[in-house]
């Protein structure tokens, strides 16, 4: 095709061709170097005659009511100048139609129908009631965090999705 758009997780920019745990990575093996996946992708498109630009875009900056960062690669075979898209929406703007869309903006007019909603246990509900809009398990009282999280409390990572409540006044 004359043009293409490819999207992926932003981690593709730092992904090595050969995945090896960090502690076991051989600094002298080029395939284990960070960013080698992207290097190969760019090289292959260049061999096919494409001029490319790439970057990380966040859907919230383009009218989607969600923070969602994605790697985007745009290519052209026509030797035309191509650019990453300019954001259309902003956290603050004097014109409301150019501001980030919130969860509330998106669902405000929907009819409430809980037909088949997930049923939470009494214990889980008791934790969720303590978490403010836009918060997560870290907003629980300190003495309840370990109880609420169970075995996941000791696991690595940020765990921000656990006991998460969306904010009606923010993108999700």
Where are these regions (language model features)?
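Conserved Class I SAM-dependent methyltransferase catalytic core
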Residues: 1-68, 72-76
């Amino acid at each position: 095709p004359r043009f293409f758009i490819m999207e992926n997780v932003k981690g593709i920019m730092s992904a090595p061709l050969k995945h090896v745990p960090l502690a076991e990575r051989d600094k002298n093996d080029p395939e284990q170097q960070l960013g080698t996946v992207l290097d190969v992708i760019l090289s292959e498109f260049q061999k096919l005659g494409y001029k490319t630009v790439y970057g990380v875009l966040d859907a919230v900056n383009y009218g989607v009511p969600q923070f969602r960062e994605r790697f985007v690669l745009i290519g052209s075979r026509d030797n035309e100048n191509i650019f990453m898209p300019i954001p259309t929406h902003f956290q603050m703007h004097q014109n409301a139609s150019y501001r980030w869309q919130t969860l509330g903006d998106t669902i405000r007019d929907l009819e409430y129908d809980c037909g088949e909603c997930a049923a939470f246990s009494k214990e889980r509900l008791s934790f969720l009631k303590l978490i403010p809009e836009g918060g997560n398990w870290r907003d629980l009282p300190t003495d309840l965090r370990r109880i609420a999280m169970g075995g996941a409390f000791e696991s690595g990572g940020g765990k921000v999705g656990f006991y998460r409540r969306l904010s009606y006044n923010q993108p999700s």
